[in-house]
Amino acid sequence: MANHPLSSSRSNRPFFVRSLAGHTSNLIIPDEFFTAHLEGKTGLTKLKLTSDASDRIWDVRLNGRRFAGGWDDFSAAHCLRDDDVLVFRLDVKMVFHVTPSGRSFSQIRTSSSSGDYDSDDDDDEAGDDDSDSKNISLKKKSRFEAESSSSEKYCLLGLTASNLRLNRVSFTKHFSRANGLTKRCCMIDLMNLSGESWTLGLRHNKRTGQAFIRGRWRSFCHANELKPGSFYRFKLVRNGTRPLLQLCFKVIPQGNCSNSKANGKANVSEKYSREDGSASTKQNKFLTVTLKHYMIQSGQLRLRRSFVRENGIKEAEEIILVDKNGVEWPSYVSSSKQRREFYMAHGWIRFCEANKLKTGETFTLEFVRGEGTTPMLKFCSEAKIEQEEAPEERGTPLPKRARVSAEVGHSRRTQAPNKSSDDPKILQRKQPLQPCSFSDQAKKVKQSIVNILTGIKRFRSELELKERNLEAALLEIDALGDKVSEINKILK
């Protein structure tokens, strides 16, 4: 396995390069990089990996300098091959961003105006022509720079009691320089996952040299229920005279945000939410089903492997089907260990019958997995799917009709019992469903009320905007009338 430790990149962030060619075990962090940037850190037992291909943050355990548990899952999810070359860039404390630099390529030539580091481009095979090797290196370098520039649109903002009290938060110097936000004084918009925007001021701290935003940071955090001690990922969707930052997904540390800085580490645990992701990640949130006769006969709905892999389904588990009216139908995902396939074993036939879905009809389900809750497959409209797949959408608007409350869903479920199967193998796979506790129902009711209030706030802001536009139009009409009167007087 090739070893290419590098001290710094064009962005002045430490990184190292590893080739997967001919490897027989998990990757090892180069000794030079480990000594310079990681040695001596307390509690160095695991790290975090991110990539442009997924919004997920992957936990990888460390056995000394060698990657251990979690690396195989990361490799499988990103379809890594033995001729890939990976760039590991240290973004924040123990969080590495992984970028592929191409196939069958042994080294990357890095150059900077300051001349921090410069390495030669050599091919693995000694018999190759020098000019061909340089051409390949330049192509791989351009691809690496393009992929790195796309990742520079993202930033992690830590929420602390201090920046809530001051009503401001600072960007990293690298993010500010990469996106031209240094020494600027303008308005900037923060957008949440529902498409609502808050206007803040972008300012520059002359003492620290950092760019920061202030004004409505506390209001944005409270409205979106962001918790102190957490890191949240934002994407720079629009730059220019008025930049726009959109909340992508959140990452919650194991310890407090302010304490992590003192301890010299940021232990981050993974959490999912709806985000901008790659096109493949967005598509794999949706499961499109064309109802066939053999599906009804077998009572099984097979799930494609990419859908299972991208949504973290690793074993048999309960799942809830939610129809277009918000009614929930308990189901169960079973697995075939021999074929390594997953399928829904029961419940979904009753779901189709109740929603009057006929053989030959096509419908789409959206996968939603909350923290510590049973995953759901929600009936999705075509308009919502098109909006999710649009690359420049400002965000997913909230539904106009509020979700049915938990009590209604629970009562409807009692009227729609699951159809039992005569197959003894399926009966063995079934597991008893646990009844919903009062606290779970209270959480659902609370979430329903929050969704209604959020929708009301959004509609209220839209009405206020339309009202201001109408008032401006009336003023223009009055001004035009005055001008017409003056012209008539002159003509008379």
Swiss-Prot record:
Chief place where the protein resides: nucleus
KW Lipoprotein (keyword) present: no
Record GO biological process: megagametogenesis; pollen development
Biased composition (Acidic residues): 117-131
Compositional bias per record (Low complexity), positions renumbered to this chain: 105-116
Organism superkingdom: Eukaryota
Subcellular locations according to the entry: Nucleus
Keywords from the UniProt entry: DNA-binding, Nucleus, Repeat, Transcription, Transcription regulation
Disulfide cross-links: none
Residue ranges of DNA binding: 12-104, 154-250, 286-382
Biased composition (Basic and acidic residues): 385-395
Region of interest (Disordered), ranges: 105-134, 385-427
SMART domains linked to this entry: B3 (SM01019)
GO cellular component entries: nucleus
Keyword Transcription regulation: yes
Pfam families: B3
Molecular function terms, GO-annotated: DNA binding
Protein name: B3 domain-containing protein REM3
Annotated source species: Arabidopsis thaliana (Mouse-ear cress)
